[in-house]
């Protein structure tokens, strides 16, 4: 039965299979996004303290992003490798990868909890907290860090459920926690009047429930890949392979911390507190656009990884073409949406008219290159699915570290205006997407040879 379920990745019609895997994965990403988005929405409406509380929460984003990045390091580094081993018929090796990923998640959770808790206040101040916002930021992140292990397990291990083609189960693991968070947030924040502490507590309790669900599934007979005690023992060779592939998604997520710090400090320097609030809202909207698109790419990755392991390159090529079409359609639609209704989107996060007017004015500029971003996401995820760690790492660095951060630092100085920071994003998006697509097309024949390109004998 397990062999039949995994073979679906290599035999089912691609369009139907993409729909089956991508829709639940998109839903899972969207639901997962609600953990932080819902907190921001509720905190942004706390009476008499909305702006300071929302700004304080924004200062904690780099830490939260780093916690998620380490989960991606172990989870997204291990899951494609496990899928490739499944495709090659090596289930024992796939489960060994799962066990070592679990061990890596537990180790990083312990280090992150102790490290961030010990140096919480200086880190928050370095990330842009002021005397007015440090109390809100410290209250939120202090409680959030207590649940680091739950975040690591829920996010990191869920990728192994998707890797075996069980996208609906992966979606449910996120849905359970997200729904609980939506229910608990208003109760803890407003009814119990716990404010930002209540939002953090609701989040970690919800992640704990999701983590328990994921662990229970991966230990049950219904899972093709199962957690086995013998394989949880760290194996340096296996962990090295996980780390090699996990570096790229880690950098993709961890550099969000760097971007947030650069944007926040730049907005404070060239614009002031109102502009810091605007970038917090804009980044939230960016997350609403990007995370569902990531769900599409992550849902399709197991198809490409399995067929790449089975050397069915034609099927991988067909999957990529459809993935590119879908991601471009999504990001082009997002471009139109933010151009037409920026004010509607801003009102989700704040009732303050001055902030709404500012966000409505700068949002079309900030998202001016989002239409091209779908190409980078499709190519980046395909390199990841094919086990191309070095290329994935280079592309992960390109958009944020090589392009966006320097542009966000240079443009406001050159133009003498805060608008230069908003303009950095579309320039980076377009340049990175064009470079990534060109690189993929130049390497396509080498990675996925056709019958006429394949070496003879």
Question: Predicted segment positions?
Answer:
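Residue-level signal for transmembrane alpha-helical positions in Major Facilitator Superfamily
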Residues: 19, 34-35, 62, 74, ...
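Small-residue-rich hydrophobic transmembrane alpha-helices
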Residues: 54-114, 151-170, 278-342, 373-392
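Short runs within selected transmembrane alpha-helices of multi-pass transporters and secretion channels
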Residues: 144-162, 170-178, 199-212, 294-297, ...
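N-terminal transmembrane alpha-helices
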Residues: 9-49, 62-77, 81, 85, ...
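Small-residue hotspots at the loop-to-helix junctions and early N-terminal turns
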Residues: 51-62, 138-141, 200, 273-288, ...
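Short alpha-helical transmembrane segments in multi-pass integral membrane proteins
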Residues: 1-22, 82-149, 191-247, 304-369, ...
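Transmembrane helical elements of multi-pass membrane transporters/channels
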Residues: 20-39, 143, 177, 206-210, ...
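Helix-terminus/linker motif at the lipid-water interface of multi-pass membrane proteins
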Residues: 30, 34-55, 124-131, 187-194, ...
